[in-house]
Amino acid sequence: MAFQPGSRGGRGGARGGARGGARGGRGGFGGRGGSRGGRGGFDSRGGARGGFGGRGGSRGGPRGGPRGGARGGRGGARGGAKGGAKVVIEPHKHAGVFIARGKEDLLVTKNVAPGESVYGEKRISVEEPASEEGVPPTKVEYRVWNPFRSKLAAGIMGGLDELFIAPGKKVLYLGAASGTSVSHVADVVGPEGLVYAVEFSHRPGRELISMAKKRPNVIPIIEDARHPQKYRMLIGMVDAVFADVAQPDQARIIALNSHMFLKDQGGVVISIKANCIDSTVDAETVFAREVQKLREEKIKPLEQLTLEPYERDHCIVIGRYMRSGL
């Protein structure tokens, strides 16, 4: 019994650089870090865990090093797929639309307002050789057109034969929202073309107006597409009508605008969302009914395409407006 305190003190010395008798400040040399105080004096566990930098030393190395490096790399990749010579731009079968071939193939349009992105999309700058000798090559900027964000892009990716939207054309866009797809349509028609963008809701309408400030070929109209007579003084005759209004009476809305603004033999491109028209029947039945309504309004259907896998229960219908009747 007499020796117990002494032996405990000794044990304390071994355990913590005098955790028992003279409890040496819980850590001998270097407090909790040094050789980790001693939870075993200089034993292997203490050394490995604490070392001379303890937690900061061994763990901090990898944390600051590779992780920081990797993050930097990611940041670099995100600034837009600026491939230069690595990316090859090829024209798509639809004029004004292009394919960027690199690590992955991307649908792109030539940016009407270089340096400006609309919804955070990637931009690709490519040097195009000059047509004359002695003239430096020009940089052309393209914007990636995401088919998951745009019904028209989804239709192009799905293989639409006819688009009616091409460089120099005038397009009436119904249901413009904040201008995501409108900005790409503006790129397709180019500086010689025009896009009349009609949107009824004021909040996305504000974003549409701010986008149009940078693109002189977009004319934003904050008005109800059900009443085309309210904006008839702003719009001339157009070559194509694109509609993405998602309303039960959308066939009527398209017909009213086509009768008022669309040229004879002009194109009609309609995105149909089945659930917005009738959610009680299957999508195919809804699409068939809508196509029949278009026929009754002198719009001859040319093709119908589902937007899977980009959109569920959506289709896109291309038609030609026959003013004199089908």
Swiss-Prot record:
Its EC number is 2.1.1.-. CDD domains: AdoMet_MTases. S-adenosyl-L-methionine binds at T180, S181, E199, F200, D224, A225, D244, V245, A246, Q247. GO terms for cellular component: box C/D methylation guide snoRNP complex; nucleolus; small-subunit processome. Keywords: Methylation, Methyltransferase, Nucleus, Ribonucleoprotein, RNA-binding, rRNA processing, S-adenosyl-L-methionine, Transferase. GO terms for molecular function: histone H2AQ104 methyltransferase activity; RNA binding; rRNA methyltransferase activity. The modification Asymmetric dimethylarginine is found at residues 8, 11, 15, 19, 23, 26, 32, 36, 39, 45, 49, 55, 59, 63, 67, 71, 74, 78. Its main location: nucleus. Residues 7-83 have a biased composition (Gly residues). SUPFAM superfamilies: S-adenosyl-L-methionine-dependent methyltransferases (SSF53335). It is found in: Nucleus, Nucleolus. By homology to other fibrillarins, some or all of the N-terminal domain arginines are modified to asymmetric dimethylarginine (DMA). InterPro entries: Fibrillarin (IPR000692), Fibrillarin_CS (IPR020813), SAM-dependent_MTases_sf (IPR029063). S-adenosyl-L-methionine-dependent methyltransferase that has the ability to methylate both RNAs and proteins. Involved in pre-rRNA processing. Utilizes the methyl donor S-adenosyl-L-methionine to catalyze the site-specific 2'-hydroxyl methylation of ribose moieties in pre-ribosomal RNA. Site specificity is provided by a guide RNA that base pairs with the substrate. Methylation occurs at a characteristic distance from the sequence involved in base pairing with the guide RNA. Component of box C/D small nucleolar ribonucleoprotein (snoRNP) particles that contain SNU13, NOP1, SIK1/NOP56 and NOP58, plus a guide RNA. This is rRNA 2'-O-methyltransferase fibrillarin. The gene is NOP1.
